[in-house]
Curated annotation (Swiss-Prot):
NCBIfam families: L9 (TIGR00158)
Role played: Binds to the 23S rRNA.
Keywords: Ribonucleoprotein, Ribosomal protein, RNA-binding, rRNA-binding
PROSITE patterns cross-referenced by the UniProt entry: RIBOSOMAL_L9
Protein name, as recorded: Large ribosomal subunit protein bL9
Length: 147
């Protein structure tokens, strides 16, 4: 009996592979536990169509992330904060403040956990990286100025 593995099965194969197994093992264990489906022509066509759709979605996400990267690399956000007597910041600029400024000034809503930057404890211009999906990373400028 031929089965299409839905999940990885130790000692047999990985998800998406078609394997030839004994009828009892295929029907009772693999199909019974939801690890595989009987590899009929209809099931294989359905699997290939789903695989193609998933790849198209990934390509679309990559394309959107590349566009976002191109947009972000041309912007600079400004964060104004109070300064001490010697011109130093009170505390430091947090990733949350950067994410809020990016949303308020440019309209991009990002997760603060996706931001990568050094501790910002002085005025100046800093590079901040935003990690996007599929290994894409965008850098933009953050200017910290006193009020």
């Amino acid at each position: 009996m031929k089965v299409l593995l839905i999940k990885d099965v130790k000692g047999l194969g990985k998800a998406g592979e078609v394997k030839d197994v004994k009828d009892g093992y295929g029907n009772n264990f693999l199909i019974g536990k939801g690890l595989a489906k009987s590899a009929t022509d209809a099931v294989l066509k359905q699997y290939e169509a789903a695989k193609k759709r998933a790849q198209e979605e990934i390509n679309y996400e990559i394309n959107q992330n590349e566009k976002l990267k191109a947009e972000l690399e041309n912007i600079k956000i400004i964060i104004k904060t109070k300064l001490g007597a010697n011109g130093a910041l009170f505390g430091s600029i947090t990733k949350d403040e950067i994410a809020n400024a990016l949303k308020e000034q440019k309209g991009y809503e990002v997760d603060k956990k996706a931001l990568e930057c050094d501790h910002i404890k002085a005025t100046g211009i800093y590079d901040v990286a935003l990690k996007l999906k599929h290994g894409i990373s965008a850098k933009f400028k953050v200017e910290v100025a006193g009020e």
